[in-house]
Each structure stands twice: as structure tokens, then as C-alpha cells.
A protein has these predicted regions:
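Conserved, mostly hydrophobic/aromatic
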Residues: 15, 77, 103, 118, ...
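Catalytic domains of carbohydrate-active enzymes, especially glycoside hydrolases
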Residues: 38-50, 112-125
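Hydrophobic faces of well-ordered beta-strands that scaffold small-molecule active sites
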Residues: 21-27, 45-49, 72-78, 126-129, ...
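Active-site-adjacent structural elements in enzyme catalytic domains
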Residues: 54-73, 102-120, 319, 324, ...
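Short glycine-enriched loops at secondary-structure junctions
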Residues: 28-32, 74-84, 124-134, 174-180, ...
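Preference for extracellular/luminal or secreted protein segments
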Residues: 1-41, 248-249, 278-396
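Second-shell residues forming the walls of enzyme active-site clefts
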Residues: 57-67, 82-84, 149-323
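N-terminal hydrophobic targeting/anchoring segments and the immediately downstream early-domain regions
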Residues: 1-93, 381
Length: 396
């Protein structure tokens, strides 16, 4: 197979420094070429930007792809529409709005708008759909970002997003493994906990992940979320310890790889979050995240420092060569599955400016208006004020 040959040939000819660099997907804070060159100097595997003006983002991604040896993964938080990629993209609606409209077609349209508009900029990886479950309404992360509290509905709607993403040749990242929405605390501030039993998890989150993996989801985002039931099941010595999934071999290898059969790429959630940083010294946790089952590190406090931590971790044995090669192979395989190696040769990694006409199309705007209408939900009407009729004056 030509694609496999590209992966293996590329890997065989990579230096240690290049393999270390591929493990990182930093966030960009400037579109200045000098700044971009600094990031690219570390042989990064991916590059993330928050939403910006479409023309500027497209130009930035073009520059980055033209100045890197191995094509970049360009991810974006495409959770609610094209506005996740560009400020002048279509703001479609949150996942909860799709669920409230009560038809999976709205989730398909979300995926179609988000991924087609993202693709127009050169984005090739959606950090979506969110497949968390709103089990606890106090949770500060999930709420309107999810498809609700019914696992079957969450799966059905996430599957439609995945279908649309596939049509746009966009990789998805189902998140946040092993599942947010149980705890009411925020991983930005600490390591939160999914406290479900193994049986409860299997029937809910586990069922969602299993089916989406079987449907072809290419990547999984590991949250800074512990799940004691499964962690202690696979390793009784962890009893009483809170270890985030992003650092847990038990959850990433024993559960995700071995039990659920996932063979794609695993990326951490943002590692400057306290849910990750509180787990130990960064000089240890950065290489340990890869050693314990993640394939890429999302964001950095300092890319140069993290790069050195990873390199030192490899040299002192925290990161094995076997795991380094495996992670790089998965990164390259994802790129090959998206035809990035072929697009680089043809200089087609980022579309031309004419592709920007796909943003805020008449159809996309109409879809957004329809979702806004259909997602309005009556929660309660104790005073029986609805429907509002022109003949009735509430104040009387």
C-alpha cells in the first residue's frame, strides 16, 4: 500500500529531533512569519489557532504548510459551526441546540457547516464532536456543548457529525475521554472524576465510544479526568489515587486500546490545564503522557521547554523508543489517511482564496436560522401564558 509505504519511509528517515517534535501540537498566538518559524523550528506535528479572520487564517496555514518538511495537522474547535475556525464563519448553534431541535439532521448540518468552512481555511482536524453526557447539571464544562443526557441521543447525533466530517475529509476527535459530565468540577482548575461504576460506564459513555470507534472516528481526545472504577480494576495499586486519563495507561491502553479496540491517534486535552499540571512535574508528565498512551501533546506552557522535557525524558528512559515510534507512526498514519502527503506534493494542503466563498453561504445561514427556530424549547408554563394570542393581554 502506497500510504503505508509513505508512513514507514518517512519514519525511517526521521531524526530523533523530528520524532520528538511531531508529538507536539502547540497553539499559535501570532501570525507573524518570524513567530511561525520559531514554532516550525521544533518540527511540530500540528498547529492550532483560535478563530481569526478567515483570510488571515488561510494565509497563515499556507505559510506554515509551505515551510514544514512533514505536512501539519491543523485542528480547530469546530463544535458549533464555522465560527470555530473563523470569526467570519457561520455561527450555527451549540450541540444542545441540535438536540433540542430533536432531529439528527441538525447535527449533520452542524458537521457539514463546521467542517466545510474549516476545510476552506486549510483545517483538517475537528476537535469535535463532544460526546460527553449531561448527567450533572452543575458541571461547568458540558452543559450546552453536549447533545444531552441520553446516551442513545448523544451517539446518534455524534454519528451524524462524523458522517458530515467524513464527507469533508476532516478527521474528528471524540472527546473528552473517558467522559465529562458526572463531576461538577472543572479540569481547568483540577483533575475531575468520572465516578461511574464499570457497568454504568459501559452502558453509557463506553457504548458511545465503542460505536463511534466502530464507525471510524480517527482520533480521541484524552481528558484530564480520572475514572477510579476502571483504573483500580486494571491496577489495584491505584486505589485512592486520582490520575487523569491523559496520564493513565489503564484508561488509554487497557480500556481504550485493548477493550474498545481503538487503533487511531490519541491527543491530550490542553496540557496547561491544572487537571494535567497538578499531576506532577512537567519534566516528568510531558514524556509520561506519551509513554502511557497519548500520541500528541496539545498546547504548551513553553514549547521550547516542553520539547526539551520530552527529549530528556527519552534519553533518561521515561519515554521508550517503542512508544516514540508508535506515536509517530500513528501521527503519520493520520496524515496519510487525510491524503496530506499527496496534497503536499500537489501544493493543495490549503485551498486557494476562492474556497472562502464556502463561508456563510446562503444555505448555511438558512440552516442556522432554521436551527434557531426549531431549538426553542418550552421547559414549563405554569401560568399557561402560551401560546400568546393577540386577543389576550397578560397584564389585564
Amino acid at each position: 500500500d502506497v500510504d503505508i509505504a509513505w508512513v514507514e519511509n518517512t519514519l525511517e528517515n526521521m531524526s530523533l529531533e523530528e520524532m520528538i517534535g511531531q508529538l507536539f501540537c502547540p497553539i499559535g498566538y501570532s501570525t507573524d512569519p518570524e513567530y511561525l518559524n520559531m514554532l516550525l523550528h521544533f518540527h511540530i506535528g500540528g498547529l492550532f489557532f483560535r478563530d481569526g479572520v478567515a483570510e488571515e487564517m488561510q494565509s497563515t496555514f499556507t505559510y506554515a504548510q509551505e515551510h514544514t518538511k512533514i505536512p501539519l495537522l491543523i485542528p480547530s474547535n469546530l463544535e458549533a459551526g464555522g465560527d470555530g475556525a473563523a470569526t467570519n464563519g457561520t455561527a450555527y448553534g451549540k450541540q444542545m441546540a441540535c438536540a433540542a431541535a430533536n432531529d439528527p439532521v441538525y447535527a449533520y448540518r452542524l458537521g457539514k457547516i463546521a467542517c466545510s468552512e474549516g476545510s476552506a481555511l486549510g483545517i483538517n482536524w475537528a476537535f469535535a464532536p463532544v460526546v460527553d453526557i449531561d448527567r450533572n447539571y452543575h458541571n461547568p464544562i458540558t452543559n450546552v456543548r453536549t447533545y444531552g443526557d441520553d446516551p442513545e441521543k448523544v451517539y446518534a447525533y455524534a454519528r451524524e457529525y462524523l458522517r458530515a466530517a467524513d464527507e469533508c475529509n476532516m478527521a474528528v476527535s471524540i472527546k473528552h475521554f473517558p467522559g465529562d459530565g458526572v463531576d461538577e468540577r472543572d479540569q481547568h482548575l483540577l483533575t475531575s472524576v468520572n465516578s461511574l461504576s464499570m457497568e454504568e460506564w459501559d452502558k453509557s459513555y463506553g457504548s458511545i465510544y465503542q460505536r463511534l470507534i466502530d464507525d471510524g472516528a480517527k482520533t480521541v481526545m484524552a481528558g484530564h479526568i480520572a475514572m477510579p472504577a476502571y483504573q483500580e480494576h486494571f491496577n489495584p495499586q491505584l486505589k485512592g489515587k486520582i490520575v487523569p486519563a491523559s496520564l493513565s495507561r489503564e484508561l488509554l491502553v487497557n480500556l481504550l486500546r485493548d477493550k474498545l479496540g481503538f487503533n487511531g491517534l490519541v491527543i491530550t486535552d490542553a496540557t496547561p490545564m491544572v487537571g494535567f499540571t497538578a499531576a506532577g512535574k512537567r519534566s516528568e508528565t510531558v514524556p509520561m503522557a506519551i509513554e502511557n498512551g497519548c500520541d500528541m501533546i496539545l498546547f504548551n506552557k513553553d514549547l521550547k521547554e516542553d520539547y526539551q522535557f520530552m527529549l530528556d525524558g527519552y534519553k533518561n528512559g521515561l519515554l521508550s523508543r517503542e512508544r516514540l515510534l508508535d506515536a509517530n507512526r500513528r501521527i503519520l498514519a493520520l496524515k496519510a489517511s487525510l491524503r496530506l502527503h499527496e496534497k503536499k506534493i500537489k501544493r493543495q494542503l490549503v485551498p486557494g482564496k476562492e474556497a472562502l466563498k464556502n463561508l456563510r453561504t446562503t444555505e448555511h445561514i438558512q440552516w442556522a436560522k432554521e436551527l434557531a427556530d426549531q431549538s426553542v424549547t418550552l421547559v414549563k408554563d405554569i401560568a399557561e401564558n402560551l401560546p400568546i394570542l393577540s386577543l389576550i393581554h397578560i397584564s389585564e
